[in-house]
C-alpha cells in the first residue's frame, strides 16, 4: 500500500531529495533537486565546491545564513580483486555492522551499478571469528562482474551509497541520508515561509557539501557570504530509543520539537532569540548541552573570517548513520517554523556580543 502524502510538510520535495545519491564530494544529484525547488521562489546560485544557495530579502542587506548539509556518508571503491569483488573505504563515519548484506548503488562513470555488500557466512567462520565485529576491510561489494568487466566499468575512486529509499511508517519518515538531507530540506522550507515578509536581512538558505568529512562546504560558503549570524540545521540523537542516555543527550524524544544546542561554540544571543520566538509562537523545543564542538556545520561557520555568531537547531533522529534512519514529521515542522519565526523577528544591528 502506498503511503499517503503528509499534509504537515512538503513530503514530495523531501522524498525527492532522499532518493538521490549524494555522498560527500558527490552532492550534485541532491543539489540539483534542491536548487530546482529553490528556483521556484528564491534567487539561486552555487559555487565550485558543491554548495547551493537560495536567498530572499534585500540583495544589499546583511546576510543571515541557514545551513543544512546535502551530503551523506558513503563508500569509495579502492580496489578490484581477482574475482571482480570490490574493496571499499568509508566516506564518513560508518558502523561496518550495518553494511553487511546491504544493497549498494555505485555511481559509475557510464551509469549506476547495483551490488551487494558481502561477508563470510557464519557457517564457514571459525568459532573465534564469530566473536569479532566486522571491519570494513573484511567486507566487499559483489556486482556480479568479472575482474575485467569490473575494472572497465568501475574505476578506483567510484562513489557508492546504500540503496535504500524513503517511506512513511506512521507519522515517521524512514530513509538513509536523513542525516542530513532533512536539514537541507528544513532550511529551504523555512526560507519558503519567509516569502512576502518584510525582511531586513538577506536570508540565505544553503545546501552545503562535505559536512560528513569535515564541514568543508560550510567553511567555503560562510567565507563567501560573510553572514552577520548563522544557523546550522542537523540531526541529533532521539532519546526515546534503547541505549541513548538522556543524561548525556538531554530529553529529546520524538514529538518534542526543535532541539537547540547550548554551549561555548554557539551564540547565547541567538539562543535567547530562538527561545523567545518559540515561546511566542507555541513551537515546541528542547535544549541539549554541547560543552565542546557541536559536530555540525556550525563549527566551521563560527570560525569564518572574524567569526560568525551561530546556533544549532537539530531534528531528533533514530538509528543515525544507518540505512534506515527515522525522524518524526512533527519535529521537522517545528524546526521549519522556528527558523522562519526567528528570521522574521531578527533586527538589523543586533548586538551579538556574548
What are these regions (language model features)?
Residues 1-354:
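N-terminal hydrophobic/helix-forming segments and targeting peptides
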Amino acid at each position: 500500500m502506498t503511503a499517503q502524502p503528509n499534509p504537515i510538510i512538503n513530503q514530495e520535495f523531501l522524498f525527492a531529495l532522499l532518493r538521490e545519491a549524494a555522498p560527500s564530494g558527490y552532492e550534485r544529484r541532491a543539489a540539483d533537486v534542491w536548487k530546482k525547488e529553490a528556483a521556484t521562489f528564491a534567487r539561486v546560485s552555487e559555487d565550485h565546491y558543491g554548495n547551493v544557495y537560495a536567498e530572499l530579502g534585500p540583495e544589499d542587506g546583511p546576510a543571515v545564513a541557514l545551513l543544512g548539509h546535502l551530503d551523506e556518508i558513503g563508500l569509495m571503491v579502492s580496489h578490484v580483486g581477482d574475482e571482480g569483488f570490490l574493496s571499499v573505504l568509508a566516506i564518513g563515519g560508518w558502523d561496518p555492522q550495518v553494511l553487511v548484506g546491504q544493497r549498494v548503488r555505485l555511481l559509475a562513470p557510464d551509469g549506476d551499478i547495483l551490488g551487494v555488500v558481502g561477508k563470510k557466512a557464519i557457517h564457514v567462520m571459525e568459532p573465534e571469528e564469530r566473536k569479532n565485529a566486522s571491519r570494513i576491510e573484511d567486507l566487499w561489494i559483489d556486482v556480479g562482474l568479472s575482474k575485467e568487466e569490473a575494472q572497465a566499468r568501475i574505476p578506483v575512486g567510484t562513489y557508492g551509497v546504500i540503496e535504500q529509499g524513503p517511506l512513511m511508517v506512521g507519522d515517521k519518515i524512514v530513509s538513509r541520508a536523513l542525516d542530513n538531507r532533512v536539514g537541507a530540506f528544513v532550511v529551504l522550507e523555512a526560507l519558503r515561509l519567509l516569502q512576502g515578509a518584510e525582511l531586513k536581512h538577506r536570508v540565505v538558505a544553503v545546501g552545503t557539501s562535505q559536512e560528513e568529512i569535515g564541514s568543508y562546504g560550510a567553511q567555503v560558503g560562510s567565507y563567501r557570504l560573510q553572514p552577520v549570524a548563522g544557523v546550522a540545521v542537523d540531526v541529533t540523537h532521539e532519546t526515546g530509543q534503547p541505549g541513548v542516555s538522556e543524561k548525556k543527550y538531554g530529553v529529546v524524544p520524538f514529538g518534542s520539537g526543535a532541539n537547540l544546542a547550548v554551549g561555548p561554540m554557539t551564540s547565547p544571543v541567538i539562543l535567547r532569540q530562538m527561545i523567545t520566538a518559540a515561546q511566542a509562537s507555541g513551537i515546541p523545543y528542547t535544549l541539549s548541552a554541547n560543552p565542546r564542538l557541536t559536530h555540525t556545520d556550525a563549527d566551521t561557520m563560527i570560525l569564518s573570517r572574524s567569526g560568525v555568531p551561530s546556533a544549532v537547531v537539530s531534528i531528533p533522529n533514530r538509528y543515525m548513520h544507518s540505512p534506515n534512519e527515522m525522524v518524526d514529521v512533527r519535529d521537522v515542522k517545528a524546526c521549519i517554523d522556528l527558523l522562519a519565526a526567528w528570521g522574521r523577528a531578527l533586527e538589523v544591528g543586533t548586538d551579538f556580543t556574548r
